[in-house]
UniProtKB/Swiss-Prot annotation:
Its main location: cytoplasm. GO terms for molecular function: ATP binding; histidine-tRNA ligase activity. Keywords: Aminoacyl-tRNA synthetase, ATP-binding, Cytoplasm, Ligase, Nucleotide-binding, Protein biosynthesis. Gene3D superfamilies: Anticodon-binding domain, Bira Bifunctional Protein, Domain 2. Its EC number is 6.1.1.21. This is Histidine--tRNA ligase. One of its GO terms (biological process) is histidyl-tRNA aminoacylation. The gene is hisS. Homodimer.
């Protein structure tokens, strides 16, 4: 007996119902991207390893899926190199390509390659899968989709304002209540400066970013373990625990960061974003959160993170401002800002809250039962007519037993079934059965259409 087939760990199959839900998510996000003037690009699933390596740090490089060269890949490799068992070095000999790890580095490569064809500022979006050789666990996969929108070639804070509006609109369409948290890398820099630990900004922000997860006491312990003196930790406490409205926090920061040029610039930028989105009537909760420190290695200005208010789950969207996106490919001076929507987590949130519209996940709306060639020939013109009216309809392809055809309709959750026999054909009508209520009625083709579309 043949072994039962399987799929690689960290990957998934999606059923027709699951795909209908996923496409609803992708289409909703895509529609909002279009509404704000973003244009779609796609990049290859595989990139040259020279494009990918060194862009994600040592740990990130280890998570790249590398593609083995075809042909005699041992050619040119010495016995000494083989015996060294240096996996990284040998991989560079065996593999010249890898699966993309994210959409950001391929986007940077795209901008550099096509800079003479692009009009700047360039507003682009991508909805494509990425791959990471991570250890699979709940909520973490080796293959998953990213939905990214970035605008490059502009320093204007209006771009940040638009991104907040886009986040608000996307989750408004989904019916999900969210909190949009905002911070600024310059504010974090200013905080590190005024407590006298400017060179420890990464250690400080990595620690305070964990405040919600591990609590203040453990954050302080981590700061101390990084060599930050107690005096500096004491100065930090009232800042990271700052409460009140966004306006009150900003006013306090103007005083606290008065001696930090970078810090005050961050406050100014945050104030503009917060005041503008408020004036524009953004419906979601927007909060200045000084503990937010995601992506510190590459974000240089505003930082965003989005949390669902009614479901316990991690970040479902995030992003920020970065400088010199294309610098790693020799094209300097390209600033940008972007966000990414976590499609897989949004999928889970909508499932938990049961927020998928019926029309988004329903498949066939009307099934024509097939009793034979004569009956099928009668049904086909009507089937064509209802499809032209926008009704998702099909005819059972075989003249099988009625029980089997009705079972098919039940399995696919088809709400209406059209039954045509000798009597219906003689009268120019159909029997329409409502599969939810069990009611049947004799109707004309026009009446059938009106009932199904109601």
């Amino acid at each position: 007996m043949a072994a039962k087939p399987g799929i690689p760990k960290g990957t998934r199959d999606f059923s027709p119902v699951e795909m209908a839900k996923r496409n609803y998510i992708f289409n909703t996000i895509r529609d909002v991207f279009h509404l704000f003037g973003y244009q779609q690009i796609e990049t290859p699933s595989m990139e040259n390893l020279s494009t990918l390596m060194g862009k994600y740090g040592d740990e990130g490089d280890k998570l790249l899926f590398k593609i083995q060269n075809s042909g005699d890949y041992f050619n040119g490799i010495t016995d000494e190199e083989l015996l060294s068992r240096n996996a990284v070095k040998l991989a560079s000999k065996f593999c010249e390509k890898g699966l993309r790890y994210d959409l950001t580095v391929p986007f940077a490569r795209y901008v550099v390659m096509h800079r003479d064809e692009i009009s700047f500022p360039f507003k682009r979006y991508q909805i494509q899968p990425v791959w990471r050789a991570d250890r699979p666990q709940k909520g973490r996969y080796r293959e998953f989709y990213q939905c990214d929108a970035d605008v490059v070639g502009s320093n204007s804070l209006l771009n940040e304002v638009e991104l907040v509006q886009m986040i608000d609109r996307v989750f408004g369409k989904f019916g999900v209540r969210v909190s949009i948290k905002i911070n600024n890398r310059k504010i974090l820099t200013g905080i590190a400066e005024i407590i006298g630990e400017a060179d420890k900004i990464v250690d400080i922000t990595v620690a305070i970013d964990k405040l919600d997860k591990i609590g203040l006491e453990n954050v302080n312990a981590e700061l101390a373990s990084k060599g930050i003196p107690q005096e500096a930790i004491d100065k930090l406490q009232p800042i990271i625990l700052l409460s009140g409205s966004n306006e009150e926090k900003l006013e306090t920061l103007k005083t606290v960061l008065a001696t930090s040029e970078a810090g005050l610039k961050g406050v100014e930028e945050s104030e503009f974003i917060l005041k503008t989105v408020s004036a524009l009537g953004v419906k979601s909760e927007v909060e200045l959160d000084l503990t937010l420190a995601r992506g510190l290695n590459y974000y240089t200005g505003a930082i965003f993170e989005v949390k669902a208010l009614d479901v316990q789950i991690g970040s479902i969207s995030g992003g920020g401002r970065y400088d010199n996106l294309t610098g790693v490919f020799g094209m300097d001076g390209m600033s940008g800002v972007g966000i990414s929507f976590g499609a897989d987590r949004i999928f889970d949130v909508l499932n938990q809250l049961d927020l998928y519209p019926k029309e988004a996940v329903n498949g066939t709306e009307l099934l024509f039962v097939n009793f034979g060639d004569k009956e099928a020939a009668y049904c086909l013109p009507i089937l064509t007519k209802v499809r032209e009216a926008g009704v998702r309809a099909e005819i059972y392809p075989d003249a099988s037993k009625m029980k089997k055809q009705m079972g098919y309709a039940n399995d696919k959750q088809i709400p209406f079934v059209a039954i045509v026999g000798e009597n219906e054909m003689n009268e120019g009508k159909l029997t329409l059965k409502n599969m939810t209520t069990g009611e049947q009625s004799l109707v004309t083709p026009d009446e059938l259409l009106a009932v199904v579309k109601a």
